[in-house]
Amino acid sequence: MDDWSAEQYLKFEDERTRPSRDLLAQIPLSAPRKVVDIGCGPGNSTELLVARWPQAEVIGIDTSADMLRRARERLPGYTFIEANVAHWVPPADADLLFANAIFQWVPDHLRQLQRLLGALPSGGVLAMQMPDNLDEPSHVMMREVAHSGPWRERLAEAARAKDLLARPGAYYDALRPLCERIEIWHTVYNHALEDTAAIVEWVKGTGLRPFVDLLEPMERKEFLREYTARVAAAYQPQADGKVLLRFPRFFVVAIR
């Protein structure tokens, strides 16, 4: 894919940051010395970590140069590193590995979570959240449009590249032997957005990218036209004209 767009991502900053706040609230650390924000994006989640633990050394890592540029502008004086978590080795003295909405993009992420949790010292925490929305209309219709147009062959891999998350028990069984305690839960958010066009704008920043990034400009326009029409049919307006984007998310907090 092309580089991530921080500007597009931040169009829904409050809604995207809310799961980070909810994840942060469940972390039982009073004074960690070193905190790493994995997949820090434009620094909105990193900012929460800095606010909660101002005395800690907080580091952000991401693969996107544009996201890292925005993070450095947001939090000057903090360290942000361009790195792929699949090949990244955490510092031996890290007390917290925090990951908001990143591991759904990482191949074989359950094995990666085991590796990272196993690298933490006793009492260290791995806290992560992933969208669990591939069965939601917003994402089902991406795959439907990918399979139905003249681009179907080019988009075939993108349409099947992401699998549904494993059942919660699979995460429990994989991580429990590596930690003293583990908490696993789902939260379903219902984001009130202005209209169905806002839903399309939301997913342009994340879920749509593996599809539209492979298309030529005119094809991209046609794909988005068809996708937008399907979204408009699937999400009916509320009494005030807004639409509710149902968004399930999966959380894990594991204490080494």
Curated annotation (Swiss-Prot):
Its EC number is 2.1.1.144. GO terms for molecular function: trans-aconitate 2-methyltransferase activity. Its main location: cytoplasm. Pfam families: Methyltransf_25. Keywords: Cytoplasm, Methyltransferase, S-adenosyl-L-methionine, Transferase. Belongs to the methyltransferase superfamily. Tam family. It is an enzyme of class 2 (transferase). It comes from Nitrobacter winogradskyi (strain ATCC 25391 / DSM 10237 / CIP 104748 / NCIMB 11846 / Nb-255). It catalyses: trans-aconitate + S-adenosyl-L-methionine = (E)-3-(methoxycarbonyl)pent-2-enedioate + S-adenosyl-L-homocysteine. This is Trans-aconitate 2-methyltransferase. Catalyzes the S-adenosylmethionine monomethyl esterification of trans-aconitate.
